[in-house]
């Protein structure tokens, strides 16, 4: 399975990931100059926290959002392992929002459904990784992610 890896040392806080996620995934028009005037406003599924750290769904192996959802709206794609929202059955109870350990799941602008990163599963490749100018967001194999995550920081010898 592939996961999104964010290198906080490469992220410059430009918010391109948010901008394009909101435009390409959440807007009706799919055009930036029109999307900013849409009602309800398009809500991106990835967020830049503080100055330079993009946050997105981790697609947890034991996803609390799936367990908490009372009617099966939060689902896992059996082929990709991605957790996604099946919007037609969402009752806006916000149980998934409350239990997400990363604070990634949010109500939509209309407050009718929950929204979260599904890694652009209908596009084939996450738009946030595609548009990141510094390649701070990358799609990598889970094993490579674990290797990188546990690499000791580089040291300077004096």
Question: Can you annotate each of these PLM segments?
Answer:
Residues 1, 5-7, 22, 27-68, ...:
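Flanking helices and flexible, charged tails adjoining ferredoxin-like Fe-S electron-transfer domains
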Residues 12, 18-22:
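N-terminal signal-anchor transmembrane alpha helix
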Residues 12-13, 124:
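Glycine-/small-residue-rich active-site loops that bind phosphorylated ligands and cofactors
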Residues 72:
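A short, small-residue-rich loop immediately preceding and capping a beta-strand
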Residues 80-81:
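Membrane-helix interface segments
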């Amino acid at each position: 399975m592939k996961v999104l890896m964010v290198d906080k040392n490469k992220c410059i806080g430009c918010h391109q990931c948010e901008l394009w996620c909101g435009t390409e995934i959440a807007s009706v028009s799919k055009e930036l100059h029109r999307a900013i005037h849409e009602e309800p406003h398009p809500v991106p599924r990835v967020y830049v926290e503080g100055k330079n750290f993009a946050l997105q769904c981790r697609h947890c192996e034991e996803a609390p959002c799936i367990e908490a959802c009372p009617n099966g709206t939060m689902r896992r794609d059996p082929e990709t392992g991605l957790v996604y929202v099946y919007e037609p059955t969402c009752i806006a109870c916000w149980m998934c929002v409350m239990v997400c350990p990363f604070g990634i799941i949010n109500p939509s602008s209309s407050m009718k459904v929950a929204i979260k990163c599904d890694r652009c599963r209908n596009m084939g490749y996450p738009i946030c990784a595609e548009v990141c100018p510094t390649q701070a967001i990358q799609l990598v194999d889970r094993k490579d992610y674990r290797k990188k995550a546990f690499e000791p920081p580089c040291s300077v010898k004096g």
